[in-house]
Amino acid sequence: MSAKAYYHLPGLFEFCEFYRAFLPLYRANRDWFYDWCEIGSIYGAPADCLWGGGRAGFGECGAREALALAQEYGVSARLTFSNSLLREEHLSDRKCNALCELFSQANGVQNGVIVHSELLTNYLRTRYPALYLVSSTTKVLTDFEDFRRELDREEFRYVVPDFRLNKRFEELNALSQVHKDKVEFLCNECCWFGCNDRKRCYEVVSRKNLGEDCEHRCKAPDAQSGYRFSKAMENPGFIGVDAVLRTYLPMGFSQFKIEGRGLGSALILEFLLYYMTKPAYQLRVREEIYLDNMLDLF
């Protein structure tokens, strides 16, 4: 059984101001939060990053500012560089290389990169060996044997499978502890469980980050409603807080990713309340972050 769950949180650049409010609260009032979980990392990418993927980045926070905040609270900072369509000429991008250089020279906790492209994986291993690598969920690893082979790869510290493997308990439990330690489950995906277009959706984001003009219309039922946490909770691949504590930790798994870079900070707070905060203190966290006696909704 794993002793602790480590959550990997969205929005290093996108929600820098939110974390500037939340992290001091988390440190000063640790008893408000479950003692069986910690923040494993915060991930994201600035706007207009050529190597970006997964979501089109919109983070406006400065790189040094975002990194300094993570370092102040002893949290690993991850760059989301999961563009799947990179070519050799893209490796010389000055902005992305400068970010890797900055993050690789950081003191204290080690920082990492979430990556898809094999070309970029090899480049980062050679050029920035101080950064650990995470195999991105944008690879859409839905075949368990493909996932197992990805876990075998020594270049990756963690591997994020497609959310549709989350409940394959017999095969998951049969993994060695070395492999279990590398699995990072995506907990709160809202994507239609039967989607056959997921990889193409991610490729469209990669093309947009490369400056290409392309459109993609989601074909999932209820796609027009967008992300709703209540809908994600009904997804067959959803991993709830009780499942983390009573199923996955006892099985020996410890790494859990929360998605949400393209959402609003109010929803990010709801994720952290649900996954990390004791029910008796959830209202107090809201009051400390935004809720006062003069706040009007309408």
PLM regions and their residue ranges:
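Active-site pocket-lining/capping segments in soluble small-molecule metabolic enzymes
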Residues: 1-150, 156-298
